[in-house]
Design a protein with these regions (language model features):
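Beta-rich carbohydrate-recognition and catalytic domains
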Residues: 1-127, 131-174, 185-235, 257-307, ...
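Beta-rich accessory regions
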Residues: 187, 213-435
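Catalytic nucleophile-His microenvironment captured as a short glycine-rich beta-strand/loop
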Residues: 182
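Repeated scaffold domains used in trafficking and secretory/extracellular systems
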Residues: 60, 176-179, 240-242
Length: 435
């Protein structure tokens, strides 16, 4: 499930992730590992971290210690330091580290573990480490029940708590998970973005990701753009635990394309769950409100080969993208040979994805309900609009207005979608992805 330790080193993107090698459902968690040169084509690698006497290997992050502050490498060959949650069978959660001297292929655990001991609470997990430009040291943010804690260290081994944030924003009682904190430049200044994943989100009662905009004073996050309503990173059902890549030029984020409500019941055999596309994050103003946008990354070479299509065009691949521009109300439909349909509705006030008739759904009582079949992103858009739809076997990722709105939805069609049709004044281009 959760992406872990996302990092870019020497032209290679590393995706570690929560992995149970013994079953297709959650269990004794390891860190799986995959690598890519382009964020689209991934190759599985040997398991990176195995459970030990401290417990399962839960979520965490990785940094490139270029100055060898940890002294686990050399100046000529700096180490990658992974920091993760050790989850003991009795529920105790503490933070541990491991280091790699071969660019992330293999890791050795520190004899100092745990480097952050539990302060006496449950749900104390998911450290996301980053360079602190204010104190010029390492910092991390981790989830602590319904809030996040901040820690600082000079060497990744000895940590001091520096602050807290939350609960704020979405006031539903639930646990925060998989936090991330990072700056994005906007009009010549850095705006700090805090992302938290929530096990239970407001009226929807499903997991979702919320973000806050503000500042980081070197010790804690300060929300400078409060909102009466939660600000969601994705309005769909199936994007959770997303975090950013370290050591990358752009701010790129990747999530788990699934929902805890039905993750253990999905009707798949060769895989269970998937990562989302990497998304390039930026800030933009929407109706005078500073807003986080997330546009798909890594698709440039495929978009260059896109071509216009007519209504009711046949699609000959299970992985493809659609670039759509239009104005006014519209309906877009992906169909297969047995009559199953994934429908997208667009208007000036909202975008709706309806998977009610999209495929096999009897595997879960949650997946079948209307509450888990129709996802909507509210918006205000007059005149022309644009969408990009990316479909990969069993997941749709929709991006509106270059990522201002996003909806991620998994579906399980009995046969591949092989036709696209629409109603409305639209211009549609198709590109195929050889993933």
């Amino acid at each position: 499930n959760d992406p872990n330790g996302l990092i870019y080193i020497d032209g290679i993107w590393h995706l570690y992730y929560q992995h149970n090698p013994n079953d297709v459902v959650w269990g004794p968690m390891h860190w799986g590992h995959a690598v890519s040169k382009d964020l689209i084509h991934w190759e599985h690698q040997p398991i990176a971290l195995y459970p030990d006497e401290l417990g399962f290997i839960f979520s965490g992050s990785a940094v490139y210690d270029t100055q060898n502050s940890s002294e686990y490498g050399t100046n000529e060959n700096p180490p990658i330091i992974a920091i993760y949650t050790s989850h003991h069978k009795d529920g105790l959660e503490q933070q541990s580290i491991a280091y790699s001297n071969d660019k992330g292929r293999h890791f050795e655990k520190s004899y100092l573990n745990p480097v952050i001991k539990n302060p006496g609470i449950s749900d104390f997990r998911d450290p996301k480490a980053f360079w602190n430009p204010v104190r010029r040291c390492w910092s991390l943010v981790l989830a602590a029940q319904d809030r996040v804690f901040f820690y600082a260290s000079q060497d990744m081994k000895n940590w001091e708590k520096t602050g807290e944030f939350g609960p704020e924003g979405n006031h539903v009682k639930g646990v925060w998970e998989c936090p991330d904190l990072f700056p994005i430049e906007y009009k010549g200044k850095n705006v700090w973005v805090l992302v938290v994943s929530m096990t239970k989100a407001s009226e929807d009662d499903h997991c979702k990701m919320q973000y806050f905009l503000g500042d980081f004073d070197g010790e804690k996050f300060l929300c400078t753009c409060p909102s009466d309503e939660p600000r969601w990173l994705d309005e769909g059902f199936d994007n959770y635990a997303a975090v950013t890549f370290q050591n990358a030029k752009d701010v790129l984020l990747m999530g788990w394309g699934m929902n805890w409500q039905y993750a253990a019941q999905t009707p798949t055999e060769e895989y269970c769950g998937q990562a989302t596309l990497a998304r390039k994050l930026s800030l933009t103003e929407v109706d005078g409100v500073l807003t986080l946008a997330a546009a798909p990354a890594g698709l440039e070479k495929f978009r260059h080969s896109s071509y216009p299509i007519e209504n009711h065009t046949t699609i000959r691949t299970e992985t493809f993208g659609l670039k759509i521009s239009g104005k006014g109300d519209a309906k877009i439909c992906l169909k297969n040979s047995v009559g199953q349909k994934l429908k997208i509705y667009v208007s000036d006030t909202k975008i709706t994805v309806d998977r009610t008739m999209a495929g096999y759904k009897e595997f879960s009582e949650h997946f079948m309900t209307e509450k888990y079949s129709i996802s909507t992103a509210a918006r205000k858009k007059d005149g022309a609009w644009n969408l990009e739809l990316v479909f990969d076997v069993s997941i749709l990722e929709l991006f509106a207005e270059d990522g201002v709105d996003a909806i991620s939805t998994v579906v399980y069609p009995e046969t591949p979608y092989d036709r696209v049709s629409w109603k409305g004044d639209l211009s549609v281009e198709l590109y195929e992805i050889d993933a």
